């Protein structure tokens, strides 16, 4: 939705439906098809509360949308109340229920990352794309992120597409891994297959040296 592909097709298959082509769709239409994402660089509304950030994500699943929420007509009061309830529920799952009225800019770095994931989850996706979510995190924050992603996958039934350089995190979370080196796929397989792949070892660890 942000950068059009130079070639090929992007297809997404919502549960129980036929594949849909994403090429050429606007970002909001991509979201409506069940794909949500976070960015490598945090893109929160820093001067809005934690709750308001998540509510913005939820508005894509309403009939009134963002404009209706701003105008606050009588017809959408019930819908707005439902958005608040749904947003609280997401924050509870993510572990941020105690920060609903805090400004996003005041959250610790790891909590800001969680808030981005919460906002993406509020769109009710079946596929969640996480772009280097562990970037800039310390080991404790990375472990907490690992636990959160497992929870989202196993308890919420949301598929995760993870783009990440932290190989320990990738190996612990993934069922299937694609390895890209300078824009070209050099390997595909299970974590164990990738761990023992000569091309991956060469690209990421350097040439093997005899002891």
Task: Name these PLM-found stretches.
Residues 1-211:
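Glycine-rich phosphate-binding loops of nucleotide-dependent enzymes
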């Amino acid at each position: 939705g942000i950068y059009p592909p130079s070639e090929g097709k992007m297809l997404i298959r919502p549960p129980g439906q036929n594949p849909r082509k994403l090429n050429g769709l606007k970002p909001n239409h991509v979201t409506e098809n069940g794909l949500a994402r976070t960015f490598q660089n945090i893109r929160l509304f820093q001067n809005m509360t934690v709750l308001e950030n998540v509510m913005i994500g939820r508005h894509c699943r309403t009939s009134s949308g963002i404009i209706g929420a701003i105008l606050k007509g009588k017809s959408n009061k019930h819908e707005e109340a439902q958005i608040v309830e749904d947003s609280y529920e997401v924050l509870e799952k993510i572990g941020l229920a105690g920060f609903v009225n805090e400004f996003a800019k005041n959250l610790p770095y790891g909590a800001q990352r969680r808030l981005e994931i919460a906002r993406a989850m509020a769109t009710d996706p079946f596929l969640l794309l996480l772009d280097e979510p562990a970037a800039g995190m310390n080991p404790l924050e990375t472990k907490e992120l690992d636990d959160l992603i497992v929870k989202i996958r196993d308890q919420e039934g949301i598929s995760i597409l993870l783009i990440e350089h932290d190989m320990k995190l990738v190996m612990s979370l993934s069922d299937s891994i694609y390895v890209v080196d300078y824009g070209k796929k050099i390997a595909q397989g299970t974590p164990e297959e990738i761990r023992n792949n000569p091309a991956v070892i060469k690209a990421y660890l350097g040439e093997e040296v005899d002891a």
